[in-house]
């Protein structure tokens, strides 16, 4: 069957030429600086977002499968004949292999005026499972990152509480702790795809996304210790200690549910780029509410309507009005392999893999299409399938060499189904920046090149 999505892989698998790291074309920076300056400028004025069309890069030729007489098998390599490196090299902290040095989080040229207020994108196309290595976790800073002295860091809890308190890091880390796996996604993930395909690879279309195990104390525990009025106090304000004065309103319902005041990430202390020594973890909610360098929690009876809730992180509607406090990251998925800027070198079997997530619960099903959405088959969900965490999916695909369009469509535990881009635009228009959870399409050409397209 042509381009068959199946459950039984054939014996011989096709090969994929990986997307070259940093594969934005050489002439993109000048284009991007102009287009994205307009994009960001109009965004601040609640205008339309500009996009830059680019061509997917093509990497160098791949190595052919080994055959009879392969010297890699017949000639004994150096690592099989002598002593290797001693223990505790590289300063006592493990590093990736030198052969993987190109797998990096990367900036997008011209996205912002200064790198301290910018984004680095996670290389989703190069990752396995659901946990993002801490060193590849995407970054979003509003005024750069800091390496804060934990002995001098304090967390204040005040407002509508009986006993306002100031906690040191030692105070917090002596309290009962929990560890939970959750995804974090910037509300602007996929922002440049609202009007047309704008960037070539999944690193840039969906790379403001990561998933980690976070460790800390429940916010509800701190509120209880301080005697918070959780009836009249319907909201909490989270305030960060960096120069951007990031402040976000969080509903008390969320605060009492699964919000964590975290110091740990993936089994170690938070990295400075991720808010060391303390950050808020608000599962299912856009990343801006996961306030880094957390220094204050205030309980109040109404939202604070801060600058990052009235000017930024709002949804512009087609009639010119905007929606506020639309913080939940809706059900979404993306195929990471095969994906944009990769190249299929052979006909035959491929494992189509990707990620799905929802801010409202767990992923229940992911369907995959190889013909642009005309026919769908259910993918395998790889465990664990957790609430408000990434879920890895896989499905077998036989490519016959003809053009194909790969798509994934997720459904979460509430029954919500990920929409097509035209369905989303019918409600939201094309002038939005945030909360684009549309189905992503990857076109596979006859020559095997994979590119970013939109299907209506």
Task: Specify the residue positions occupied by each region the protein language model found.
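Detector for intrinsically disordered, low-structure N-terminal pre-sequences
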Residues: 15, 51-53, 57, 74, ...
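A ubiquitous, low-specificity "background" feature that marks scattered single residues
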Residues: 27-29, 33, 44, 148, ...
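N-terminal secretory signal peptides
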Residues: 1-38, 60-62
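N-terminal export signals
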Residues: 32, 38-63
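Generic alpha-helix initiation/capping and coil-helix boundary signal
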Residues: 25-28, 41, 49, 401
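General helical structural elements
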Residues: 19-22, 37-41, 46, 102, ...
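Structured, non-membrane catalytic/scaffold regions adjacent to prosthetic-group chemistry
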Residues: 64-456
């Amino acid at each position: 069957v042509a381009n068959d999505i199946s459950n039984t892989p054939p014996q011989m698998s096709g090969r994929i030429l990986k997307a070259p790291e940093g594969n934005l074309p050489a002439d993109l920076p000048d284009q991007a600086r102009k287009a994205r300056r307009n994009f960001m400028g109009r965004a601040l004025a609640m205008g339309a977002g500009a996009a830059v069309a680019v061509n997917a890069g093509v990497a160098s030729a791949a190595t052919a499968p080994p055959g009879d007489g392969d010297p890699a098998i017949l000639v004994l390599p150096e690592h099989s004949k002598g002593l290797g490196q001693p223990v505790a090299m590289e300063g006592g902290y493990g590093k990736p292999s030198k052969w993987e040095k190109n797998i990096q989080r990367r900036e997008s040229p011209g996205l912002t005026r200064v790198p301290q207020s910018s984004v680095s994108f996670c290389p989703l196309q190069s990752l396995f499972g659901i946990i993002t290595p801490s060193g590849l976790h995407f970054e979003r800073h509003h005024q750069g990152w800091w390496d804060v002295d934990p002995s001098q860091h304090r967390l204040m809890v005040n407002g509508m509480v009986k006993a306002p308190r100031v906690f040191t890091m030692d105070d917090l880390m002596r309290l009962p702790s929990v560890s939970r796996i959750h995804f974090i996604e910037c509300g602007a993930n996929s922002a440049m795809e609202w009007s047309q395909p704008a960037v070539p690879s999944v690193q840039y279309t969906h790379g403001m996304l990561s998933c980690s195990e976070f460790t800390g104390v429940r916010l509800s525990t701190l509120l209880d210790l301080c005697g918070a009025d959780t009836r009249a106090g319907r909201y909490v304000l989270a305030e960060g200690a960096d120069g951007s004065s990031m402040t976000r309103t969080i509903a008390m319902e969320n605060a009492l549910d699964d919000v964590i005041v975290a110091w740990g990430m993936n089994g170690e202390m938070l990295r400075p780029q991720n808010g060391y020594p303390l950050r808020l973890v608000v599962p299912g909610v856009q990343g801006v509410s996961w306030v880094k360098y957390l220094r204050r929690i205030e309980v109040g009876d109404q939202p604070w309507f801060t600058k990052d809730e009235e000017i930024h992180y709002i949804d512009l509607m087609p009639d010119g009005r905007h929606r506020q406090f639309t913080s939940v990251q809706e059900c979404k998925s993306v195929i990471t392999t095969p994906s944009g800027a990769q190249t299929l070198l052979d006909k035959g079997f491929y494992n189509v893999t990707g990620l799905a997530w929802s801010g409202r619960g767990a992923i229940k099903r992911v369907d995959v299409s190889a013909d642009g959405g005309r026919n769908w088959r259910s993918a395998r969900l790889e465990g664990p399938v957790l609430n408000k965490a990434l879920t890895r999916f896989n499905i077998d695909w036989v490519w016959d060499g003809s053009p194909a369009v790969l798509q994934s469509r997720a459904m979460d535990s509430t029954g919500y189904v990920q929409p097509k881009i035209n369905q989303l635009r019918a409600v939201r228009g094309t002038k939005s920046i945030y909360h684009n959870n549309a189905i992503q399409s990857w076109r596979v050409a006859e020559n095997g090149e994979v590119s970013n397209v939109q299907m209506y």
